[in-house]
Swiss-Prot record:
Disulfide bonds: none annotated. It is found in: Plastid, Chloroplast. The gene is rps18. HAMAP family: Ribosomal_bS18 (MF_00270). It comes from Aethionema cordifolium (Lebanon stonecress). The lineage of its organism: Eukaryota, Viridiplantae, Streptophyta, Embryophyta, Tracheophyta. NCBIfam families: S18. InterPro entries: Ribosomal_bS18 (IPR001648), Ribosomal_bS18_CS (IPR018275), Ribosomal_bS18_sf (IPR036870). This is Small ribosomal subunit protein bS18c.
């Protein structure tokens, strides 16, 4: 196929390669909270390997470290911060109920 006949010409745009989320010096450990917190969602769930862009071995180590941190109560199992914010923002009205005879 000739280059002039192509329907969609290839773009020559360059792309910047993303830095890996785990550097070679980083140690995946349950005590390394700054590293572990990057791989947890706002709800407290462990993010998938595709979202994290890590290797299978790194994802396994991250998962084990997060689970150990949860057991040792360094991390919460569920993050209900939004639920508490909503309940605090709504004012409670305390009214006395009167019975009608």
């Amino acid at each position: 196929m000739n280059k002039s006949k192509r329907l969609f010409p290839k773009s020559k745009r360059s792309f910047r390669r993303r830095l890996p989320p785990i550097q070679s010096g980083d140690r995946i450990d349950y005590r390394n909270m700054s590293l572990i917190s990057r791989f947890i969602s706002e709800q407290g769930k462990i993010l998938s390997r595709r979202v994290n862009r890590v290797t299978l071995k790194q994802q396994r180590l991250i998962t084990i470290a997060i689970k150990q941190a949860r057991i040792l109560s360094l991390l919460p199992f569920i993050n209900n911060q939004k639920q508490f914010e909503r309940s605090e923002s709504t004012p409670r009205t305390t009214s006395l109920r009167t019975r009608k005879k």
